[in-house]
């Protein structure tokens, strides 16, 4: 369900400070974050974010097409390894 328009987009305050600081000094170092719920703002375009997937931080380069989406949409949290084949029991 989308967020109400009167509330506006959500971004974690600590993450916003890190992004503004990186843009101000033109730092190319990736920004590490656990805030998957934050919305991608136009200020973030061109930055690399290290987004936590529950186990490790995955690097994601932010492009213009990602603006308006959440950070967590671009990093999967579950790994699907497929179903195992049925093991037929051999009769002797």
From Swiss-Prot:
Q: Which UniProt keywords apply?
A: Ribonucleoprotein, Ribosomal protein, RNA-binding, rRNA-binding
Give this protein's Gene Ontology molecular function annotations: rRNA binding; structural constituent of ribosome
- Taxonomically, the superkingdom here is Bacteria
Q: Name one GO biological process term.
A: translation
Query: What InterPro entries is this protein classified in?
Result: Ribosomal_uS19, Ribosomal_uS19_bac-type, Ribosomal_uS19_CS, Ribosomal_uS19_SF
The similarity comment for this entry is: Belongs to the universal ribosomal protein uS19 family.
Q: What is this protein called?
A: Small ribosomal subunit protein uS19
What's the source species for this entry? Buchnera aphidicola subsp. Baizongia pistaciae (strain Bp)
* Gene transcribed to yield this protein: rpsS
